[in-house]
Regions:
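Outer-envelope beta-barrel architecture signal
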Residues: 63, 74-76, 142, 164-168, ...
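Outer-membrane beta-barrel pore domains and translocons
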Residues: 72, 83-85, 173-177, 218
Length: 219
């Protein structure tokens, strides 16, 4: 739930109910069972409701950056372009519509199977309680990407003159070569059609990696 454009307001997950005694001793919603997520009663009133939701961070990056480098040497030219961002949170909403029962995500293999088996992934269920909005689906949106890299070679003037051209340049180029991120969605550059859904990833289409070879000829 978005409280303001700058904040994500969610229930806070604090592990998994490992046994019935633990479930009985802690505030929980009526549909919770052993192996389900344990939510924090942040105001200590003995109830779990909207008053327990907590501002867990902003979907807006605190820092955006880019790095551009270029080098020319004896006919060779090299350029590289990096970009990145840090300081933002992403709500990975695509995982809320892929219940563990269908094994769409690999983390289902680490699910709770019995007491002590997991403190992170709840038992497999077909949606419901464990998929309500919470910090379970919050991830760091920071990333570092090699956006473009190009290596080219321009023929010496004497050689291009002999083939009756002003210049000839051969190059190879890579676009979106790699992205370093802890985000498990398709792309940390989350797109939204609504300003109130900023930072909510509903399966943003991933950026494509493109590799090309080209030849620039000037007559």
């Amino acid at each position: 739930k978005l409280d303001e454009l700058e904040s994500l307001l969610l229930d806070v997950v604090d592990g998994i109910f490992q046994n019935q005694a633990e479930l009985d001793a802690y505030p929980h919603l009526s549909q919770a069972g052993v192996g389900d997520l344990r939510f924090v009663d942040t105001n200590d009133d003995g109830l779990l409701n909207g008053d327990d939701r907590t501002n867990i961070g902003s979907p807006i990056p605190t820092f955006l950056y880019g790095i551009n480098l270029g080098l020319d040497f004896k006919g060779f030219d090299f350029s590289v372009d990096f970009q990145g961002q840090t300081g933002n949170k992403i709500y990975n909403a695509k995982e809320t519509v892929r219940p563990d029962l269908y094994n769409f995500e690999q983390h289902v293999f680490n699910r709770w199977k019995g007491e002590g088996s997991s403190e992170v992934e709840p038992r497999a269920t077909a949606g419901g309680y464990n998929f309500q909005p919470s910090t379970r689906f919050i991830q760091d949106g920071s990333f570092f990407r090699l956006r473009n890299v190009t290596l080219g070679y321009t023929l010496p003037t004497g050689m291009s003159d002999r083939i009756k051209m002003t210049s000839a340049r051969l190059y190879v180029r890579g676009t979106n070569v790699f992205t370093l991120t802890d985000f498990t969605g398709y792309s940390p550059e989350v797109a939204s059609n609504s300003s109130i859904e900023n930072g909510i990833d509903n399966s943003t289409y991933p950026v494509s990696s493109i590799y090309s070879v080209g030849l620039n000829l000037t007559f």
